[in-house]
């Protein structure tokens, strides 16, 4: 029996009233791909990075309105900073680039169709 230890974040699950638009955003803009999903009794999509389903979208009829968001952001690591920013520009999306002090990490901050904050991180690229 081995000792317990977290290896990595497995996936993020987002509820959305805009299932088609969110699926398109995360495939066309972010570069994930749609893939197999179990036959749950509710609408949704699983979006993959390589062979791993990293984003689960669940279609809902009505948005929840919490007083304050419970998740401030989530992030992806990536390569091809210039390619990515050109992709955002082609899609007419607002974004903000920032450097993490004391590191070689560049972050590109943006919001998806539902207003969720995410950033895409590029190590050693500026």
Predicted regions and their residues:
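N-terminal beta-strand motif that seeds the catalytic metal site of vicinal oxygen chelate
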Residues: 1-20, 51, 71-74, 126
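Vicinal oxygen chelate
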Residues: 1-5, 85, 90-126
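Exposed loop/turn and edge beta-strand positions of beta-sandwich/beta-sheet ligand-binding modules
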Residues: 8, 41, 70, 104
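Core segments of cupin and vicinal oxygen chelate
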Residues: 13-54
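Helix N-cap motif at beta-to-alpha junctions
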Residues: 18-19, 79-81
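A short, compositionally biased micro-patch
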Residues: 40, 50, 81, 101-103, ...
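Short, charged/polar surface micro-motifs in flexible loops or helix N-caps
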Residues: 51-55, 61-64, 81-83
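Residue-level structural signal for beta-strand termini and adjacent loop
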Residues: 59-60, 123
């Amino acid at each position: 029996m081995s000792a317990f230890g977290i290896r990595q974040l497995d996936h993020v699950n987002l509820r959305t009233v805009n299932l088609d638009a969110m699926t398109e955003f995360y495939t066309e803009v972010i570069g994930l791909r749609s893939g197999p999903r179990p036959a749950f009794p509710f609408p949704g999509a699983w979006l993959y990075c390589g062979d791993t389903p990293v984003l689960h979208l669940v279609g809902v009829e009505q948005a929840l309105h919490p007083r304050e968001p419970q998740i401030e952001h989530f992030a992806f690591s990536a390569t091809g900073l210039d390619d990515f920013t050109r992709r955002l520009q082609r899609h007419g999306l607002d974004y903000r680039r920032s450097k993490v002090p004391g590191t070689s990490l560049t972050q590109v901050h943006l919001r998806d169709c539902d207003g969720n904050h995410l950033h895409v991180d590029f190590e050693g690229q500026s």
